[in-house]
Every structure is written in C-alpha cells, then in structure tokens.
C-alpha cells in the first residue's frame, strides 16, 4: 500500500484470495469429517444441522413467533423480509458506495471489466458463510455437553477467558490446533493472515485516497502536483497504520 498503491493491493489480493478460499474450504471440510463419528463431509454437515438447526436461521426461525392474527413472524420483519427488503439497503451501500470497492471498479480498464469484477467478487462473497460461519458452528457443536447445552464444564479450556467468559473468537484457531494435520496448518494460517492483510491493505489505501483527494487537495493545496499527492498519500498510510496499531488493543472483543 505504501509504495505500490492500488496496483500492489490488487495483485496481492489475487494471491491472497486464492489462499483464503482454498484454505477456508479445506478447514471446513476437515472439521466436518471430525464433527460426527461416522466421518464424511455430508454426514458431518447433516449432523451439525440436525444438532443446532437454530444456528442456520437468520434472526428468526419459522414458527418461532406467531403474531396475534395467527401469522408466522418469520415472513414479516425481522425475518424473510430482511433478506428481500432491508438487506438490499446495506448491500447497495457496500457495492455502490464503499470507497475501496468503487476505487477498484474505476481502476478497471473498461466498463465491462469493472462489471465482471464486481460480479465475480459478489460470487466469492457467497462462499463466506462456508469458510467463516460454518467453522464457528462446527466448533460450537463439538463443545456441547451430552444434553446439547454449552457449559463451562463441556467447553475446551481454550474457549474460556481468565474472567470466565467464552472466547468465541477462538473457534478457528481451536479447529486448526486440534483437527488440522500438521502439513496443512501452515496453509490454513496463511489463509487467515491473507484475510487480515487483504482487508488492511484495502482500507489503508482507501484512507490514503480519501485524505489526499478529498481533504488535502481540496482544502490545503488545490494546486498540488501528482508527485506531491503520492508523497502525502504514503505518509497518510503510515500514520493511519500507526493509529490503528495504537487503538486496536483497546477494541478487543
């Protein structure tokens, strides 16, 4: 981000997204084979769904709340209407107004290429539940007691903070540590690192662009040359990164 700008971010993302998708799918597949004594991905997925079907519902389950007039609240807000209604607002913002989505699209060599890139990125988003959400549900199922309840006694010690609260963010590291073969752990860890680095690089580059174009050039130096703006952009990246390092520990949890 500092020296290569958007071009460097784009090319590193190409490599990182391949590692992220392959590593995530591999981790999920291996975890599914261990979640049931029968083994197998399909059997594991069926076991997870049958054990905690409520974890596969967004906000409401069918039949969970019945309104006074006898209607199933699942078909009203919040429920399925969220998927066909409210979520479009959030997604219109993300794909149409998010700065680092826009800058990548505008950097395409043509309108057609930009449209293809957005469509492909949207397709990759559909894989996220498989490589992010599902491993968490698998870890949850593996730590239930015999009655199907998550308790401090049934949970692996790696999921308990010193204050006694559950460390939900430890699901992926726990799966990697306990179930991923030694030769594959490196790839999975690289996938997790790729997810962090990819997002960080994009956000830093976006921060640099916004500050340089919308603040520095617009209000402080309207006649700034391209070379000057590149320098300011690089300084902005470094400063933003230092600020992030300082405040990140305060945002834990």
Stretches with model-predicted labels:
Residues 1-253:
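Membrane-embedded helix-loop-helix hairpins and adjacent transmembrane boundary segments
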């Amino acid at each position: 981000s500092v020296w290569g700008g958007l071009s460097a971010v784009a090319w590193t993302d190409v490599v990182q997204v391949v590692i992220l998708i392959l590593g995530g799918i591999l981790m999920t597949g291996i975890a599914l084979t261990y979640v049931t004594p029968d083994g197998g991905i399909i059997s594991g997925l069926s076991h997870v769904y049958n054990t905690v079907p409520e974890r596969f519902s967004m906000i409401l389950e069918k039949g969970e709340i019945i309104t006074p007039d006898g209607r199933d609240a699942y078909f009203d807000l919040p429920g399925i209407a969220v998927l066909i209604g409210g979520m479009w607002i959030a997604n219109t913002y993300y794909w149409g107004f998010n700065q680092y989505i826009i800058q990548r699209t505008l950097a395409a060599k043509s309108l057609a290429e930009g449209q293809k890139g957005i469509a492909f990125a949207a397709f990759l988003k559909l894989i996220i539940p498989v490589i992010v959400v599902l491993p968490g549900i698998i870890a949850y199922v593996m730590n239930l007691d015999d009655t199907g309840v998550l308790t401090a006694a049934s949970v692996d010690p790696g999921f308990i903070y010193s204050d006694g609260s559950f460390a939900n963010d430890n699901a992926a590291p726990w799966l990697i540590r306990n179930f991923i073969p030694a030769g594959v752990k490196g790839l999975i860890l690289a996938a997790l690192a790729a997810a962090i680095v990819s997002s960080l690089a994009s956000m830093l580059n976006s921060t640099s662009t916004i500050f340089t174009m919308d603040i520095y050039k617009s209000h402080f130096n309207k006649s700034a040359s391209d070379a000057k703006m590149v320098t300011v952009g690089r300084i902005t990246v470094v400063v933003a990164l230092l600020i992030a390092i300082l405040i990140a520990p305060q945002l834990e949890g």
